[in-house]
């Protein structure tokens, strides 16, 4: 009797061994009728993901701070480093988009070094390092792209060649162990650097497949600018860790990041509001000639740009 093709924690095996990809495909074909199609596809994708992703696992840690989208907000970054230290973070991770939206992006880099922040590329770093013409933000609406272009051109002009070259050295993903949980850190999603994972349009079955394909116990992402956490039936977690560059379109001026920790009952996720000198940031933005629409968001907590990408539920919660 032949060995059965099985899937355990997102890792595909043949019998008790991992086998070469060609042999795996032959075995899957022979046993195809014994498995539902979706399980076969998930197994194959998980196996190939393991071959293609040699990312080393960092840690282990008991508690880490994770955030995305600095958007040049050096004032919020300074507050975050102090707050994360007070909360006992053993490491601090940034999921990309160091520049954009805010003023004077060069002020961010020394703070990253000072705080020993471990970063990955977002679409901004990827584009700036490669000298691309746009931010590859993933917007489709002309108004969204209009303001995205203003933001990108400003950031491009105000980042030194050395800073852009350093951005090019950043990885696009990290794997981190928190307690017994192996977490994958990405900017948009494991599939694309600029994929938007909104809470209302990321159903549980889809997230379970992403986790299977990525061979991990949790995915931490950003890019949308809106924080959320979903604990799945499989016991795994997907978190949009929030951004510290601008408010979360909720009428509040604070920004958001996440504390991730190991607990006896599983992975602990705390979405943390962070106050900072938003009046100082608004004044600096005006002195740099950035659009008043950007300044209004900082002062009111409501987005005035990049709204058209929002799904219906998230847009319904908006002021505009």
Label each PLM-derived region with a short phrase:
Residues 67-68, 92-97, 101, 118-123, ...:
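Active-site neighborhood of phospho(di)ester-bond hydrolases with catalytic His/Asp-centered motifs
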């Amino acid at each position: 009797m032949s060995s059965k093709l099985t899937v355990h924690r997102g890792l595909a095996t043949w019998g008790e061994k991992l086998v070469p990809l060609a042999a795996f495909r032959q075995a899957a074909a022979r046993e195809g009728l014994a498995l539902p199609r979706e399980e076969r596809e998930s197994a194959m994708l998980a196996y190939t993901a393991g071959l293609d992703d040699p990312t080393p696992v960092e840690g282990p840690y008991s508690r880490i701070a994770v955030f995305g989208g600095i958007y040049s907000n050096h004032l919020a970054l300074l507050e975050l480093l102090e707050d994360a230290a007070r909360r006992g973070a053993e490491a601090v991770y940034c999921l990309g988009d160091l520049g954009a939206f805010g003023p004077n992006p060069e002020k961010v880099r020394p703070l990253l070094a000072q705080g020993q922040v471990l970063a990955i590329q977002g679409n901004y770093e990827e584009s700036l390092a490669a000298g691309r013409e746009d931010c590859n933000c993933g917007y489709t609406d002309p108004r969204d792209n209009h303001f995205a272009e203003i933001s990108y051109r400003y950031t491009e002009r105000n980042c030194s060649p050395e800073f852009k070259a350093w951005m090019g050295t950043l990885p696009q993903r990290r794997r981190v162990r928190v307690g017994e949980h192996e977490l994958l850190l990405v900017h948009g999603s494991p599939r694309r650097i600029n994929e938007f994972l909104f809470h209302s349009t990321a159903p549980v079955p889809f997230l379970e497949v992403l986790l299977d394909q990525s061979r991990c116990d949790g995915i931490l992402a950003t890019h949308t600018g809106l924080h959320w956490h979903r604990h799945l039936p499989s016991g795994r977690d997907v978190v949009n860790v929030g951004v510290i560059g601008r408010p979360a379109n909720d009428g509040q001026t604070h920004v958001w990041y996440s504390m991730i920790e190991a607990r006896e009952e599983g992975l602990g996720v705390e979405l943390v509001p962070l106050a900072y000198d938003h009046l100082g940031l608004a004044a600096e933005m005006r002195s740099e000639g950035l659009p008043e629409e950007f300044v209004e968001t900082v002062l009111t907590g409501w987005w005035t740009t990049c709204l058209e990408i929002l799904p219906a539920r998230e847009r319904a919660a908006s002021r505009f």
